[in-house]
Amino acid sequence: ADFALVDEALNKLGISHFADRIYMLMSGGEKQLINLARILVQQPQLILFDEPTSALDYGNVFKTLSLIKELSLQGFTIIMTTHNPDHPMLLHSALPHSRVTILNEHGKLQTGTAPEIITEANLKALYQTDLRLVDVPALQRQICAITHL
């Protein structure tokens, strides 16, 4: 691979200090970030992120979602799977053109914008629990919340 592309990808993710580390000795979150850098080096037009924030702490979740937003703004087509309904809602606030698709409880696909698809009815049906969408004025968006244990 072109070393300049590798350096650019590591710098974009803020992980240039990982360049001399051994992959097998890294944490799960660090490996996830290295895997993202490996994708960027390939310069694809379409990027599939399969649960890109699993095993990440909140700081790295922020970096990963910010990167996904930036890649989308740069013209990459992004497909992301997630079990966290807050992520597409958060991305929608930055990328209102983005589309969300869910596999509903009947095995059918539903596609639309995050507010159209991520509804309390869909959340309750998908997760079989009492999830609520709560308006958070300070964030100027809704968040998904578990109402009780």
Predicted regions and their residues:
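H-loop (His-switch) and adjacent beta-strand-loop-beta switch element
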Residues: 91-114
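ABC ATPase nucleotide-binding domains
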Residues: 114-149
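Conserved ABC ATPase "signature" region
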Residues: 1-18, 43
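H-loop/switch region of ABC-family ATPase nucleotide-binding domains
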Residues: 82-83
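Hydrophobic anchor residue at the start of the ABC signature
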Residues: 36-37
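Catalytic Walker B motif of ABC-type/P-loop ATPase nucleotide-binding domains
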Residues: 47-51
